[in-house]
Design a protein with these regions (language model features):
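N-terminal beta-strand motif that seeds the catalytic metal site of vicinal oxygen chelate
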Residues: 1-16, 70, 127-129
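Core segments of cupin and vicinal oxygen chelate
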Residues: 8-52
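Residue-level structural signal for beta-strand termini and adjacent loop
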Residues: 36, 60-61, 100, 126
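Short glycine-enriched loop/turn motifs at secondary-structure junctions
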Residues: 1, 63-66, 105
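Long, continuous compositionally biased terminal/linker segments
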Residues: 38-82
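Short, contiguous alpha-helical
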Residues: 114-129
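Vicinal oxygen chelate
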Residues: 10-14, 71-116
């Protein structure tokens, strides 16, 4: 059910070098970097994995407060939409309405909310429509 997770870091370059070194023995490598130019946000992100990025680090914001991001797999885009509406109805704050995020890949359809404790929770579907 967990698709990927990520957290904020205080020094992106230092953490990038650290995780490249410590994840390599586990067979994990750097799969993707997301730059401010790709997203329009002032943050860098690095996704590590075995072919698919499922372990993410990123800068931007306060790394010591509510820096957790968890993405849950959805079976289809309708489930992503339903997750988003249910989360808002339950008191979550919007952090990205359902939609394509083609800077990750062409079929990446996700929605983001901030839970009551400030964590960034996402539902994502990777299947084509």
């Amino acid at each position: 059910m967990i698709d990927h997770l990520g957290f904020r870091v205080t020094d992106y370059a230092r953490s990038l070098a650290f995780y490249k070194a410590v994840l390599a023995p586990l067979g994990y490598g750097l799969v993707m970097e997301v730059t401010p130019e790709m997203t329009g946000k002032d943050a860098h992100h690095a996704g590590f994995g075995k072919g698919k990025p499922d372990f993410w680090i990123g800068n931007g914001g306060d790394a010591t407060r509510n820096g957790l991001h968890v993405a849950l797999q959805a079976p289809d885009r309708a489930a992503v939409d339903a997750f988003y509406q249910a989360a808002l109805a339950a008191g979550a704050r919007d952090n990205g309405a359902p939609g394509l995020r083609s800077h990750y890949h062409p079929n990446y359809y996700g929605a983001f909310v901030i839970d009551p404790d400030g964590h960034n929770i996402e539902a994502v579907c990777h299947a084509p429509e």
